[in-house]
Amino acid sequence: MAAQAAPELAKLDLNKNTGSVEANAVSAGGSEKEEAENEGDSEDDRDDEQAGGSAEVNAEKKKKKKRPKKKKKTAKVQSSPPRIPLTTLFPNNNFPEGEIVEYLNENSYRTTNEEKRHLDRMNNDFLTEYRQAAEIHRQVRQYAQKELIKPGATLTDIAEGIEDGVRHLTGHMGLEEGDSLVAGMGFPTGLNINHCAAHYSPNAGNKVVLQHGDVMKVDFGVHINGRIVDSAFTVAFDPVFDPLLTAVKEATNTGIKEAGIDVRMSDIGAAIQETMESYELELNGTSYPIKAIRNLNGHTIGQYEIHGGVNGKSVPIVKGGDQTKMEEGETYAIETFGSTGKGYVRDDMETSHYAKVPNAPSVPLRLSSAKNLYSLINKNFGTLPFCRRYLDRLGQEKYLLGLNNLVSSGLVDAYPPLCDVKGSYTAQFEHTILLRPNVKEVISRGDDY
């Protein structure tokens, strides 16, 4: 759940060669008898020498030890579809690090400061979990880009293909109680087409097919022990949309560059907007300015809490507003959205995304279906977002009444799809960054974006 709506909508990782023995012929001389004797002697000598040579060769062979056959090393290559758990490919848990960016200006001392380096080394488990999740995200999205996301594919096949890959690579299929809380999907796969910017995932029975002229945002999360990597990209098959994708990708990279310890959110937002809105898209002879979607934001990420929980912070993508500063040790989803429409999203279409409200007050539930469903949500997802397909996968049936009751009771939040005006096109790019004590790490960075 990459997108965090602005306040007004927030409510809603690979035989020694032996020489031959030669006998010397005896020179002719003397009588024929002597010649015969000498000839016989030489043959005997030759036989002796050959016998000696054979024994010597056999002795050498016995001395030589047979070298054990080298075991073939297993190539560190993921299968297609991705099914090999990442811990099998990286048995020592030395997962690839993300892009390391040194702090600049007044924070440049942090790169070499020994105290900060010591604090960073203390976060070993934290980094290992995040890097594992990030490498799973990279491997699954690369597979999705090559094999799943094609014109003619259904959104259901794409979403389930991504989610099956994540579950196999984490080693947690999520069918046993509590298994999804150990590792797995950080939130449901968002497949947002054209004017829809965020929070759309196919529900059961969805028949939507991806078209050649579509612009689709692919947004999914991977978690290990609640450490969520949140990253998204946009796919368009028609090159006419390249300026839109470039604008948003560059805006996200600007946000990543500007982010850092003690940096004000408003400064990041202003830089993002300036970059994005320097582009325009020409479509059917008409030029459309690319606008930053002003009521969508980046956000902090907490353990098991995609939007950082009660004390979460937002990262705007337009100028003005929040003067809050980023702090050491925080994790952020830096994401930007661009649109050819109004640059403002509203709730639209059927809801698929839900999440339990953290620290919600105790509320008496009258419906037994709501009570049972709430217990299942607690045991299998906790505060991690889920979608209706995940409930179907756990064998739940006829749960909508109970689910709606949990939403109306304030125990579960519903996250409807967020859309700009119909006919417009939107794009999104997103990375998870860690503000480590001595460096900034773009944990989800890959060769693709």
From Swiss-Prot:
The keyword Protease appears for this protein: yes
Subcellular location field: Cytoplasm
The entry's keywords: Aminopeptidase, Cytoplasm, Hydrolase, Metal-binding, Protease
GO CC terms, sorted: cytoplasm
Pfam assignment, any one: Peptidase_M24
Biased composition (Basic residues): 61-75
Domain of life the protein comes from: Eukaryota
GO BP of this protein: proteolysis
Any GO molecular function: initiator methionyl aminopeptidase activity
Cofactor(s), by name: Co(2+); Zn(2+); Mn(2+); Fe(2+)
Binding site for a divalent metal cation 2: D230, H299, E335, E430
Keyword Protease tagged: yes
Enzyme class, first EC level, given as a word: hydrolase
Catalytic activity: Release of N-terminal amino acids, preferentially methionine, from peptides and arylamides
Compositional bias ranges of the Acidic residues kind: 34-50
Positions contributing to substrate binding: H199, H307
EC numbers on record: 3.4.11.18
Listed Gene3D superfamilies: Creatinase/methionine aminopeptidase superfamily, Winged helix-like DNA-binding domain superfamily/Winged helix DNA-binding domain
InterPro entries per record: Creatinase/aminopeptidase-like (IPR036005), Met_Aminopeptidase_Type2 (IPR050247), Pept_M24 (IPR000994), Pept_M24_MAP (IPR001714), Pept_M24A_MAP2 (IPR002468), Pept_M24A_MAP2_BS (IPR018349), WH-like_DNA-bd_sf (IPR036388), WH_DNA-bd_sf (IPR036390)
Main location: cytoplasm
Cofactor note: Binds 2 divalent metal cations per subunit. Has a high-affinity and a low affinity metal-binding site. The true nature of the physiological cofactor is under debate. The enzyme is active with cobalt, zinc, manganese or divalent iron ions. Most likely, methionine aminopeptidases function as mononuclear Fe(2+)-metalloproteases under physiological conditions, and the catalytically relevant metal-binding site has been assigned to the histidine-containing high-affinity site.
SUPFAM superfamilies reported for this sequence: Creatinase/aminopeptidase, Winged helix' DNA-binding domain
Similarity section: Belongs to the peptidase M24A family. Methionine aminopeptidase eukaryotic type 2 subfamily.
Biological role stated in the UniProt entry: Cotranslationally removes the N-terminal methionine from nascent proteins. The N-terminal methionine is often cleaved when the second residue in the primary sequence is small and uncharged (Met-Ala-, Cys, Gly, Pro, Ser, Thr, or Val).
Protein name: Methionine aminopeptidase 2
